[in-house]
Amino acid sequence: MFIQFDSVNGVKIDKPFERELKVLMSPDNNANVKDFTFILSTLAPNGGCTDFHSHNESGELMIFLSGTGRAWFEDSVYDITPGTALYAPPGKVHKTLNTGNEPLQIACIFIPAISTDYILKMREESERARGNS
């Protein structure tokens, strides 16, 4: 299966966890994809981030494609640059933050596959954090 990132519409998550999520490959959108979900996460410049979170049903491999930032995993903090990666096994808490002036683009691969309802949960958590729910 071949895909161009720009051909997929994303879902925008507003502040405080400002980013865009694009489901590029998933069992939810392609019957040929069975064992993983591939989401492109683009964190907004100057502070776009995720909250501290974990995925009980799946591990997450994060491959940092562009931009700079910081990642928290368990008791460690890592500087993010293009060409670095982080794996968070199922149930392990992690967070990413864009510390630069450019978008921070992350290829997020979930093994085993997760439901793309995950994106709706991320949007709801952002709304709750802003006090809008």
Write out the residue ranges for each language-model feature:
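A short, N-terminal "cap"/entry segment at the start of jelly-roll beta-barrel domains
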Residues: M1-D35, D51, K121-S133
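Conserved short histidine dyad/triad with adjacent acidic residue
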Residues: V23-P27, I39-N56
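Short, charged/polar surface micro-motifs in flexible loops or helix N-caps
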Residues: N30-A31, L43-G48, T68, P112-T116
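Ligand-binding loop in jelly-roll beta-barrel domains
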Residues: K34, P90-T116
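Short, conserved beta-strand element in jelly-roll/cupin
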Residues: L40-L43, S54-A71, I109-I111
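Short acidic-glycine-tyrosine-enriched beta hairpin
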Residues: D75-P90
